């Protein structure tokens, strides 16, 4: 990273993989998170690899969510995961002794985000990832560590900038397709930042 931008990551994007679309009580599998600076989009653009290396994730204990927090698994969502390629599901669906309690979500976030420097919080969909995050913090006695007015969603960001074109908000930027791993929370964050960067560069 250029020294000029060292420590100036003022944006974060996060993404959940889940076992339900119920944002209030659904079980979460993993959370991916990536901090970045929009100032770099034109002056010192990111590579896919740099963003991926900068991203972090936490994988959750599913059983404990059900037994302790009364969170629910959706059969239709579980069936969907079971129909995905094994290489997609292995990393997120197979239980591990390293899986974390959802109570660790708050510390995971604040340890990986410079809250004092934060200006914008992105998710792909603010009716999905954001309420999942807020609900988990509520379940574990924590408050959301950023004000509501920082929140944006990448779909609206991209739709606005792509208005009048035939390009969709889920397009894959040139050179990224072979690097992208579907349904991986870290890769989902990286891809949305690459989408925003590419659109800004082409304005």
Task: Cite the ranges covered by each PLM segment.
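Anionic group-transfer/hydrolysis microenvironments
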Residues: 17-19, 125-126, 131, 155
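Substrate-binding/catalytic groove segments of enzymes
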Residues: 140-146, 163-172, 203
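Conserved non-catalytic scaffold segment of RNase H-like nuclease domains
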Residues: 2, 6-12, 17-123
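Residue-level signal for well-ordered alpha-helical scaffold segments within enzymatic catalytic domains
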Residues: 108-111, 131, 135, 159, ...
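A short, structured active-site edge motif that brings together acidic residues
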Residues: 56-61, 145-161
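Active-site-proximal helix-loop-helix substrate-binding element of RNase H-like nuclease domains
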Residues: 65-69, 73-82, 152-191
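Acidic, Mg2+-coordinating catalytic module of metal-dependent nucleases/exonucleases
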Residues: 117-127, 131-132, 169-203
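Substrate-recognition/cap helix-loop segment adjacent to the acidic, metal-dependent catalytic center
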Residues: 113, 127-149
